[in-house]
Amino acid sequence: MAKISRQAYADMFGPTVGDRVRLADTALMLEVEQDLTTYGEEVKFGGGKVIRDGMGQSQALSKDCVDAVITNALILDHWGIVKADIGIKHGRIVGIGKAGNPDVQPNVDIVIGAGTEAIAGEGKIITAGAIDTHVHFICPQQVEEALCAGTTTFIGGGTGPVAGSTATTVTPGIWNMHRMLEAADELPINVGLFGKGTVSNPDAIREQIANGAMGLKIHEDWGATPAAIDTCMTVADEMDVQVAIHSDTLNEGGFYEATTKAIGDRVIHVFHTEGAGGGHAPDVIKSVGEPNIIPASTNPTMPYTINTVDEHLDMLMVCHHLDPAIAEDVAFAESRIRRETIAAEDILHDLGAISVMSSDSQAMGRVAEVAMRTWQCAHKMKLQRGPLEGDSELSDNTRLKRYVAKYTINPAITHGISHEVGSIEKGKLADIVLWDPAFFGVKPALVLKGGLAVYAPMGDINGAIPTPQPVHYRPMYAATGKARAATSMTFLPKAAIEAGITEKLKLTHLIGEVKGCRNIRKKDMIHNSYTPVIELDSQTYVVKADGMALVCEPLAELPMAQRYFLF
């Protein structure tokens, strides 16, 4: 039997079982757990390669073969770290296994034919597109920035650069909801909009859901009182949508205990659980210990560095329409920024106690840094806490699965869309990000939206080949023409779909139904369901989880940072 060295094999077909890959310039190491391809029968496209007529390409008609195949992909997902070919048909993932020509090759479960496009996955790491659940729709240009960083789903609210939207992720009322759904229909990204949940009249909430709100947002800037919380939660249970909350920093309507009493045993998604982004000061972080609360972070506090605290005060003043000349406004801002809880946040992520990562785009967060900040935190925690149980210095698979779940499958489960997006699994929309390992988490090599290229780095358009400088991200065909609608999805609640909102507004996006939001718990958060007893010293702000003090130092230098953005 002919043999090939492990290095030569990796160079040709990508790493296989037992091989390890460093992620960007971090201390994180990935180890391949399983290889679903067949040694000696690998498919690869190119001159003198396998995917040719009668060899790796069969005679199958389009109905019997995939529309695209990603060959020799190294998948990093919550369910595993696996080498496989990925088959895509009609914009969805239909196979994860061995691609090729079943007439001449064994073990083929993904058929390549004349109707199949080839996407080279050799040497690439594949992740699902990120789902950002805390998007302030302040400007449409956010979409380009996010797609170029691997985010393919926006959930949030807003109507543009106006005071209400720069502070709160809310698209309020029927008229605003309709206009934003129409605007989103032109965007090459999946979209779900929050209605205003801060109202004590249940009919004012019902009408927003019936007109397209896939979730509800309670925000202190509109008022986060116990009465409004109870009303919102009651209607959410009735109509099966999720509720997100930015609770009462000033403790005006009640303290933390009043909010949790109003919530009761009903599920809710708590934003920026650490507190710098807002919420009961200083103890909103206690919500990490509630079994019915799905806690999330926003990326400006992640991870804790020597600059984190200094940049937050100015950010907060701008985002919440505060006046630095008013002492009470300054005191409000300062009450939210605590070194101790920011430090604890990193450790809570590493323990799997905070389940979701998001951006808080242009409203104290950076829309293109969801994945990057997540992996920077994972790196920091490996340096400061060592390998997790089951990991080693040379393999961080447990940690990698935990962290990738925070911005893929867990936000999808939280908002009732995990049947459509959130992982590399059969049946789901083919929102897929390909990364060169050296640029993992920072700059994708290719972003697929519904199985078609949507953004990619591209060189001189008048060049003889695609690679000459200057290379920068450019929109591709899934961002163009009618393909935008055919490859992206708008998420709507059942009530809006039954009310005919799609037809009334003439929406052309694919439509995904939000469902199963109200019967979930924190225990359903994959790799991130730890629910410790949280104690907070109200004088020192030191946080304890199950009696363990959560203390760590800020980093002075991060990976995935300046060296990647020199040009």
Swiss-Prot record:
**Cofactor(s) this protein cannot do without:** Ni cation
Q: In which pathway does it act?
A: Nitrogen metabolism; urea degradation; CO(2) and NH(3) from urea (urease route): step 1/1
- This enzyme's EC code(s): 3.5.1.5
* Residues the record lists as binding Ni(2+) 1: H134, H136, K217, D360
Q: Consult the record and explain the modifications the protein receives after translation.
A: Carboxylation allows a single lysine to coordinate two nickel ions.
Entry cofactor note text?
Binds 2 nickel ions per subunit.
This protein's GO cellular component annotations are: cytoplasm
Q: Which residues form the active site?
A: H320 (proton donor)
The family this protein is said to belong to: Belongs to the metallo-dependent hydrolases superfamily. Urease alpha subunit family.
UniProt cross-references to PANTHER family, sorted A to Z: UREASE (PTHR43440:SF1)
Subunit description: Heterotrimer of UreA (gamma), UreB (beta) and UreC (alpha) subunits. Three heterotrimers associate to form the active enzyme.
Q: What is this protein called?
A: Urease subunit alpha
Please report the organism this UniProt entry assigns to the protein. Shewanella halifaxensis (strain HAW-EB4)
* Gene name for this UniProt entry: ureC
